[in-house]
């Protein structure tokens, strides 16, 4: 969904976002000065030296902070070569891996806490807030201070510009409303003031809202993505408390989420100082030399960008983000067709492929595979029709219809929307590249948040005995707990 943070969603339009921002700055910042200084009939006349100096200083600060917000590297994790090559060692108990981390399939590397894979930057971004199309860059651990300064100086310049504009609108138009038209401002001046007023109002409103939401997130220590995750978690809890067990309706687990507090809120001052990279508040809003936090790649898994202080409100560390029961349910049901091994009997030995078969045997095998594919497609269609029938029955239930209008059913990260209609995909997160809560390193099962299932509390992890996808590990865990042998 298009909004202030995510920008236009139409393919190809985002490449024009930065030129559009530059054009808007030039129009409001420099065309306005040209109009005010050349329209002698527009009271109270040209800008004074003091007004020009203040306005142009604000514009210089705006340009500097915008350039930094666009060009500063959002950060990149660098793992030791041995750690990346010896990935299976980390997947065993006793490996050198972190206490808890996700695994990025595209980067083929662990994903530290609060990091996400950006589909625009094509890498995992430390403490990713969102990908901003207006800067063409990710708002992250390293770029957030520059982004915040840009918003502050932009709003300051707009407020001062409003003073200059409305002074001329009052004295040049309203105060002379009874004067004959030929003695008032020219048509060009009137048209210019009208366009400037419209552009100023739209820009001031949008950027003031963006500044307020950004400052709020800054003080709470949350990123936009984490606010989205927190809202989804609250929605899941609300459905659970109301007895609306969406996940147990199909008999695949009956997940009941356990409340998880946001662990990275350590107080207003600590949150703000951590985000700006220094406790010296005098440097926070310097357009040059203000700096910001830098990721510590010299000591992987330790230092800035790799670990974050928690407030201790949860039973264990590393419980954020809360698990997505819908995603776990699909994986426990067989990974939704993601991995063929989930539907295979792994204990059955497969005959070796005979590469010297005749052409007739190959044709027969090909036709057999076609029949199997057709049968699987028919089963999927049948399953889909059964779901449609269930939904049709639920729609006849007035109570369910009323509940569905107030809360959206939880879906995967791409489809679930918050109250503003945003998904993780809108924030730039490549949701398809995230393995579910499970870089299976040392002690992972002890640090993951528990999820209540039909068979008890589970951390969503399977046995860590082989280097297999997490969905398969979860499936084996379910089979083992239910005593079902394939």
From Swiss-Prot:
Q: Which residues form the active site?
A: 132 (s-palmitoyl cysteine intermediate)
Q: Where is this region: Disordered?
A: 81-101, 314-420
Regions of this protein lying in the Lumenal compartment: 37-51, 167-178
Compartment annotation = Endoplasmic reticulum membrane
Q: Name one Pfam family in it.
A: DHHC
Q: What is its membrane topology?
A: Multi-pass membrane protein
Provide the top EC class. Answer: transferase
**Swiss-Prot/TrEMBL catalytic activity:** L-cysteinyl-[protein] + hexadecanoyl-CoA = S-hexadecanoyl-L-cysteinyl-[protein] + CoA
Q: Name one GO cellular component term.
A: endoplasmic reticulum membrane
Transmembrane segments in this chain: where?
Answer: 16-36, 52-72, 147-166, 179-201
Q: Where is the composition biased (Acidic residues)?
A: 386-399
Q: Which residues lie on this side of the membrane: Cytoplasmic?
A: 1-15, 73-146, 202-486
Q: What is its EC number?
A: 2.3.1.225
GO terms in the biological process aspect are: protein targeting to membrane
* Top-level taxon: Eukaryota
Name all DHHC domain ranges: 102-152
Q: Can you name one GO molecular function term for this protein?
A: protein-cysteine S-palmitoyltransferase activity
Report keywords, A-Z.
Acyltransferase, Endoplasmic reticulum, Lipoprotein, Membrane, Palmitate, Transferase, Transmembrane, Transmembrane helix
- Per UniProt, the ranges with Basic and acidic residues bias are 81-91, 324-333, 346-376
The main location is endoplasmic reticulum
Q: Which InterPro entries match?
A: Palmitoyltrfase_DHHC, PFA4, PFA4/ZDH16/20/ERF2-like
Quoted from the entry, the domain comment is:
The DHHC domain is required for palmitoyltransferase activity.
Entries under HAMAP family matching the protein: DHHC_PAT_PFA4 (MF_03199)
According to its UniProt entry, the function of this protein is described as: Mediates the reversible addition of palmitate to target proteins, thereby regulating their membrane association and biological function.
Family to which this protein belongs? Belongs to the DHHC palmitoyltransferase family. PFA4 subfamily.
Q: This chain belongs to which protein, by name?
A: Palmitoyltransferase pfa4
Q: What is the lineage of its organism?
A: Eukaryota, Fungi, Dikarya, Ascomycota, Pezizomycotina
Give the gene that encodes this protein: ptr-4
């Amino acid at each position: 969904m298009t909004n202030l943070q995510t920008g236009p969603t139409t393919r190809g339009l985002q490449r024009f976002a930065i030129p559009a921002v530059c054009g808007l700055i030039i129009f409001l910042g420099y065309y306005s000065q040209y109009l005010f200084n050349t329209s002698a009939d527009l009271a109270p006349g040209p800008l004074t030296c003091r007004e020009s100096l203040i306005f142009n200083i604000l514009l210089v600060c705006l340009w500097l902070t915008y350039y930094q917000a666009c060009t500063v590297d959002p950060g990149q994790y660098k793992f030791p070569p041995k750690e990346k090559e010896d990935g299976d060692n980390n997947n065993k108990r006793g490996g050198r891996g972190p206490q808890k981390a996700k695994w990025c399939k595209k980067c083929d590397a662990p994903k530290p806490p609060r990091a996400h894979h950006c589909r625009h930057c094509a890498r995992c971004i430390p403490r990713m807030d969102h990908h901003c199309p207006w800067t063409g860059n990710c708002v992250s651990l390293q770029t957030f201070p520059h982004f915040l300064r840009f918003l502050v100086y932009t709003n300051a310049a707009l407020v001062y510009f409003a003073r200059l504009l409305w002074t001329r609108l009052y004295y040049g138009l309203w105060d002379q409303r009874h004067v004959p038209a030929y003695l008032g401002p020219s048509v060009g001046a009137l048209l210019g003031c009208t366009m400037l007023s419209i552009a100023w109002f739209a820009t001031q409103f949008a950027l003031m809202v963006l500044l307020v939401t950004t400052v709020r997130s800054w003080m709470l220590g949350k990123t936009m993505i984490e606010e989205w995750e927190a809202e989804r978690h609250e929605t899941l809890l609300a459905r659970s408390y109301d007895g609306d067990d969406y996940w147990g309706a199909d008999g695949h687990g009956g997940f009941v989420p356990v409340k998880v507090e946001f662990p990275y809120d350590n107080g207003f001052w600590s949150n703000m100082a951590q985000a700006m990279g220094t406790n010296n508040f005098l440097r926070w809003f310097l357009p040059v030399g203000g700096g910001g936090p830098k990721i510590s790649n010299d000591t992987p898994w330790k230092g800035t960008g790799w670990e974050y202080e928690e407030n201790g409100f949860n039973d264990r560390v590393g419980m954020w983000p809360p698990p997505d029961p819908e995603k776990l349910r699909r994986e426990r049901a067989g990974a939704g067709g993601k991995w063929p091994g989930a539907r295979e009997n792994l204990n059955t030995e497969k005959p070796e492929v005979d590469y010297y078969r005749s052409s007739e045997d190959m044709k027969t095998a090909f036709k057999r595979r076609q029949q199997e594919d057709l049968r699987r497609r028919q089963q999927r269609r049948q399953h889909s029709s059964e779901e449609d029938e269930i939904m049709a029955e639920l729609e006849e239930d007035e109570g369910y219809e009323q509940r569905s209008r107030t809360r959206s059913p939880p879906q995967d990260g791409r489809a679930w929307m918050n109250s503003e209609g945003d998904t993780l995909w809108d924030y730039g997160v490549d949701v398809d590249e995230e393995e579910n809560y499970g870089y299976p390193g040392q002690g992972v099962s002890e640090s993951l948040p528990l999820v209540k299932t039909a068979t008890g509390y589970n951390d969503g992890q399977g046995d860590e005995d082989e280097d297999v996808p997490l969905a398969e590990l979860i499936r084996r865990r379910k089979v083992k707990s239910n005593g079902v042998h394939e």
